[in-house]
Every structure is written in structure tokens, then in C-alpha cells.
Amino acid sequence: GCNQFCSYCIIPYARGRVRSRNVQNVLEEVKRLAASGYQEVVLTGIHLSSYGIDCGESLLHLIQMVHQVEGIRRIRLGSLEPRIVTETFAEELAKMEKICPHFHLSLQSGCDATLARMNRKYTTEEYENACSILRKNFTHPAITTDVIVGFPGETEEEFAQTKEYLKRIHFYEMHIFKYSRRQGTRAAVMEHQVPEEIKTKRSAQLLALAESMSREFRAYYVGKEEEVLFEEPMEVDGETWYTGYTKEYVKIAAKTAEPLDNVMKRGRVEAALTDEIYRMKL
């Protein structure tokens, strides 16, 4: 569940309030996964940042406990709210070698007026500060986000503010959504609903920006040695490559005579194999 009541979201009405899984229950599942050979786990939830508020626990403590499970070599976090990213939170995460420096911070808009109508509980300044804290504590972390275009009342000026803000933060990946009404939410009955054709136009602009920033982020790794957890084979131009991900969630492909399912290897990133996959020499 969720306690946030963003004006566009039906989840608090449909799924109720936050209900956290017991720490021991989570640890038991992680241990079962490790015993089955899994090396990476993702801690996720509808509103992950609120973990523990209903039972006297905290997300940081849960992460620290999962970090102690033998056999698990990577811990990836699901979507976070910027308010959880304090100096202490980031410093503690940076001490844990299993943490993947891949942080999905939901933004939704780069305009404070739009954020207020959305009932998001932070400002663009607070969000930017969270990104700065992460970049101070991790080397080239992957910061990804969600953005809604065409929210009721979003003017051309507000959209322009969002676009410039996104350029300044410089994300690895952005999930762009056109606002759609959810019956029963406050936003559904707001005035100044944005026409569909304008939403489509704004979405196209941000998708192009997202592709450009993503290419730039991935290109940073060319020539660098990285560790990849390989997952599965794929065919590219009639050749078989094994693909997997770095800790920053950059997709990598390598040619090899041996199967690499669930194998972790280091290699040097060479160049782009496709628009979204970089090849590696093992």
C-alpha cells in the first residue's frame, strides 16, 4: 500500500496503507534464493521508502541485514522517494560493497508548481540535493526516474521548466508517461486538462532527451573494466552473445564459447553493439 496520496494515483484507495513485511520473513526468502543460486536480489515495494513505518523498522536496517546473507553478491533497490536520501543513508549504503549504485528516484515533474498540484512531498531543490548526495558518495551512479507529461494545468512554461531541469540533473534513464485520468483521484476532476495531442508532443520531446542522456551515460564505460552478472544468450546478426548487467544496470554482451548463465565475470567494455547494449572483451 501507500500513504502518500499523490493527486493522480489510485493506489492508496485500491490497496490501502503501507504494510511492511517482517524483516525475518524477508531474510528467510533471501536465504532461500541464495541457496538456489541467485546472486542478485532486488528490494522493492509500492512505496519502498516507507518500509518499516508501520512496525518500527527502517529500509536502511533491512538493507544492512540482507547485506549479511552469504551467497548474495548484489543488492539492487527499487523506486525510492528523494526524502529518504540523506547524508547518513547514502554514507551507510556506500559502506556496503553489495549495493548496486543504481537509484531510481521518482521525480514526475521538474516544475515546483506542477509538483504541488500532484501532491508530491518535495521540491525540485530537495530532489536535486538527493541526487547530489548520491553522486558524492558513489562514483558515477546510475540515477533513473519517472516523468509525467501533460498533467492537468501543465503550461508550456511549466513543461519547459521540467525539460531544462531534466537536462541539469542528467539521468541515466527516464520513464516518460503521458498523464491519464484515474477515476476517483483529485487530478481526474482538475481544471485545465491537457489535450492528448499536446501530451504526445511533449512525450516525444522527453523521449528524445532520454535517449540522448542514456547514450552519454553508457559511453562513459567504454575502455573501463567492469563486472557483469550474465543472464542469458541472445542473437545479434546471426552471432550468439551472452548478455548481463553491470551494477549500474548497463546491459553488456560478450562472445564466449562457454555458457555464462548466472556467471559473474570482469572484462573491458569496448563499444556499442546495439543502441542499448555495449560489447565487452572478457
Where are each of the predicted segments found?
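Canonical Radical SAM [4Fe-4S] cluster-binding loop centered on the CxxxCxxC motif
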Residues: 1-24
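N-terminal pre-triad scaffold of radical SAM enzymes
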Residues: 1-7, 27, 31-35, 39-42, ...
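Aromatic/hydrophobic pocket-lining residues that form the small-molecule binding cavity
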Residues: 26, 59, 127, 159-162, ...
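Conserved SAM/AdoMet-binding glycine-rich loop
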Residues: 35-156, 167-168
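Radical SAM enzyme [4Fe-4S]-AdoMet core and its adjacent flexible, acidic
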Residues: 52-67, 71, 118, 181-212
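Hydrophobic, well-ordered secondary-structure elements that form the walls
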Residues: 105, 146, 166, 174, ...
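Internal alpha/beta loop-helix hairpins
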Residues: 173-180
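Terminal RNA-binding accessory module
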Residues: 189-282
